[in-house]
């Protein structure tokens, strides 16, 4: 075999040199060890894993560690409820987590626990360093105390009447009824949520970290580029209000590490939780002597340290954690990347609706790579929430992965294996197309690096559309009937296979298992630098189905399995079967004879109303039938000629057009129409068409010279 390289015109476009090998340590937030992982957790772990896999593909020394957050009162109480020790409980949870993350293809180098010797060592080391420098303070505070359980009560374990609106059975620090916030000591008729006893007020000495001593450093650090801009802006509120000392101790009984020289006092879980990153990495270093712990954590380390977290724990990672590290003479994070929450079908996860989906429940029904891809299409570098729309999920995965990417291989492979003994041609049928797909590697790499995965996926799918368009125009299935065209068939299908290979290189961080199957089929290792080459005079293996379509019935079964049991189901009253409607005969003769009379001009509007509509020229780069939809065609519309900015639109033009006849045409769309959730997925705009309907519909075609992206005025 031989490799043909990207043509000279595009061979020097790389924007990131690989000559400099980076040292990178990456972490996810530590999931709390008292419950099951759900799809909200999986967003962060998938996001981080994609970024880590990309860095590894680029040849950088990259380590990915995590651990269970295994301390605190909730774990202690849960273990008591189960009749086991906290250690037994967290060990069982950890084993379950390791298996679950592995099944989602999360490629941790180490998954540890905060209840470890390593974490205890570094928690004490950091605390002692802070104490020696005068950054630990003590004072007496008053708290509610459960006399039956013999323990102080955290806010969450106090219930009572709201002091503002007098609503009963409200939380110890906030009221769900009126939204008020208050101190647990202000609650009327308080009771312990643990025992039901009436708590008493009791004094205790607590230990505090002197966060205000680090105000200048933190103020500079949050504006250093280590945080997203919106996060840094939000944190300025803390400085405006004045930083407060942070309570880092809890009284016995408590499951955690006892504070040195302070009997009966324990580190608050949020002190030792982030130190768990160090503990897990130290555990990895102890198992692999080639990794030097200090070179990653020393104050002057040249390694990169990144934390991926949810937006709800920004304060701990962006104020308390860097201040602790600074005070103990360790390095601070290179960056903290925060993401938003997951909603399902536009709403908060709900057990009653079956949308509070546990990781294992998902795995019991669906391929994890479906979720990895869908999350990737939605992820950006911002902290916006991400909606898992289950119908759009099915449509997007089936359309993009099965209908576009894998479809390229399935259209071309059989010709190569059956007629040419699996050998790819030495000829390149369309050098311009090959160069365009190969040259996209630099911009796609930039999207991965900046965590703009959604933009990267759109660029990859736009390329897939162009390759499918190329194959559709060339029609190798027609050419193969002509014995004089066999070389042309081999050339066309060889280029198709090569373009599929390049696209799978780009998708490998997202779809590692599909990439492995592709590598076996192509008899070639998919490495990042391979995007600059083509396989010529190379033998491939017999094609096997690489990916199955998502079945909506399996999605429904998953949500059914996620619903709370609400008692025995009530048998529905049996209804007579509906009669099948006769086909509707549409008569448009009057509308065609006098369109204005049949459809009079609408009510007059002001110019400002019209000016709100943003009409753009677009290029149709893909068109497909929509399963179980009588009227719809799914269009992929490019808003630029390069095809890197695309929109998905469902258009009711099936009665008038065959999808394949639309590919390559230019038309007009309403580009600023709010996305609309449809049964078959999300429609991101509207194309314009004329005519009364049914077969009498004509989409608008601009004159030659109009380019995708141009505004229609």
Curated annotation (Swiss-Prot):
Is required not only for elongation of protein synthesis but also for the initiation of all mRNA translation through initiator tRNA(fMet) aminoacylation. It comes from the Bacteria. Its EC number is 6.1.1.10. A motif ('KMSKS' region) lies at residues 348-352. The gene is metG. It comes from Colwellia psychrerythraea (strain 34H / ATCC BAA-681). This is Methionine--tRNA ligase. Pfam families: Anticodon_3, tRNA-synt_1g, tRNA_bind. Its cofactor is Zn(2+). Zn(2+) binds at residues 162, 165, 175, 178.
């Amino acid at each position: 075999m031989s490799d043909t390289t990207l043509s000279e015109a595009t061979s020097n476009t790389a924007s990131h040199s690989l000559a400099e090998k980076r040292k990178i340590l990456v972490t996810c937030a530590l999931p709390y060890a008292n419950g099951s992982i759900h799809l909200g957790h999986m967003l962060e772990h998938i996001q981080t894993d994609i970024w880590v896999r990309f860095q590894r593909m680029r040849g950088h020394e990259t380590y990915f560690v995590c651990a269970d957050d295994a301390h605190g009162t909730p774990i202690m109480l849960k273990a008591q409820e189960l009749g086991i020790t906290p250690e037994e409980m967290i060990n069982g949870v950890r084993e379950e987590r390791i298996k679950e993350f592995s099944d989602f293809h999360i490629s941790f180098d180490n998954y540890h626990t905060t209840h470890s010797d390593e974490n205890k060592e570094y928690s004490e080391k950091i605390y002692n360093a802070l104490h020696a420098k005068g950054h630990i303070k003590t004072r007496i505070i008053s708290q509610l105390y459960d006399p039956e359980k013999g323990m102080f009560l955290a806010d969450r374990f106090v219930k009572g009447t709201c002091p503002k609106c007098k609503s009963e059975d409200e939380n110890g620090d906030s009221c769900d009824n009126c939204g008020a916030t208050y101190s647990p000591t202000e609650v009327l008729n308080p009771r312990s949520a643990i025992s039901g006893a009436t708590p008493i007020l009791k004094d205790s000495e607590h230990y505090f970290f002197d966060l205000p001593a680090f105000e200048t450093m933190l103020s500079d650090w949050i504006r250093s580029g280590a945080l997203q801009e919106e996060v840094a802006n939000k944190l300025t509120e803390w400085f405006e209000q004045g930083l407060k000392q942070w309570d880092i101790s809890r009284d016995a009984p408590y499951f955690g590490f006892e504070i040195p020289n302070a009997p009966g006092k324990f580190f608050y879980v949020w002190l030792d939780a982030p130190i768990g990153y160090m503990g897990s990495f130290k555990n990895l270093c102890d198992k692999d002597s080639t990794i030097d712990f200090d070179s990653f954590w020393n104050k002057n380390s040249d390694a990169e340290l990144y934390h991926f977290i949810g937006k709800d724990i920004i304060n701990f990672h962006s104020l308390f954690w860097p201040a602790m590290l600074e005070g103990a003479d360790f390095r601070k994070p290179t960056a903290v990347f925060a993401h938003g929450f997951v909603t399902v079908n536009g709403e908060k996860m709900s057990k009653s609706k079956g949308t509070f989906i546990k990781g294992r429940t998902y795995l019991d029904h669906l391929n994890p790579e479906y979720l990895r891809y869908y999350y990737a299409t939605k992820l950006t570098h911002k902290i916006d929430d991400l909606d898992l729309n289950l119908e759009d999920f099915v449509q997007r995965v089936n359309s993009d992965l099965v209908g576009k990417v894998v479809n390229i291989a399935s259209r071309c492979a059989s010709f190569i294996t059956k007629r040419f003994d699996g050998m790819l041609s030495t000829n390149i049928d369309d050098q311009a197309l090959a160069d365009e797909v190969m040259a996209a590697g630099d911009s796609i790499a930039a999207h991965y690096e900046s965590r703009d995965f959604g933009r990267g996926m759109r660029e990859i799918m736009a390329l897939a559309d162009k390759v499918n368009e190329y194959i559709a125009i060339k029609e190798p299935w027609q050419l193969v009937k002509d014995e004089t065209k066999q070389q042309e068939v081999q050339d066309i299908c060889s280029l198709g296979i090569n373009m599929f290979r390049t696209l799978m290189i780009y998708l490998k961080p997202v779809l590692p298992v599909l990439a492995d199957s592709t590598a076996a089929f192509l008899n070639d290792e998919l490495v990042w630098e391979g995007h600059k080459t083509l396989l010529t005079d190379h033998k491939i293996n017999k094609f096997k189905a690489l990916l199955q379509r998502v079945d909506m019935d399996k999605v429904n079964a998953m949500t059914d399995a996620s619903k709370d049991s609400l008692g025995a189901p009530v048998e529905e009253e049996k209804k007579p079967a509906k009669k099948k409607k006769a086909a509707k005969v549409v008569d448009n003769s009057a509308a065609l004879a006098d369109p204005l009379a049949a459809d009079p001009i609408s009510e007059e509007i002001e110019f400002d109303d019209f000016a709100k509509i943003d009409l753009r020229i677009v290029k149709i780069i893909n068109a497909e039938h929509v399963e179980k939809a009588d009227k719809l065609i799914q269009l992929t519309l490019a808003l630029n000629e390069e095809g890197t900015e695309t929109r998905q639109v469902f258009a009711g033009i099936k009665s008038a057009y065959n999808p394949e006849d639309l590919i390559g045409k230019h038309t007009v769309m309403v580009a600023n129409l709010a996305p609309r959730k449809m049964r078959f997925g999300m429609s991101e705009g509207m194309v314009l068409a004329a005519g009364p309907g049914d077969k009498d519909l004509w989409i608008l075609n601009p004159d030659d010279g109009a380019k995708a992206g141009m505004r229609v005025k």
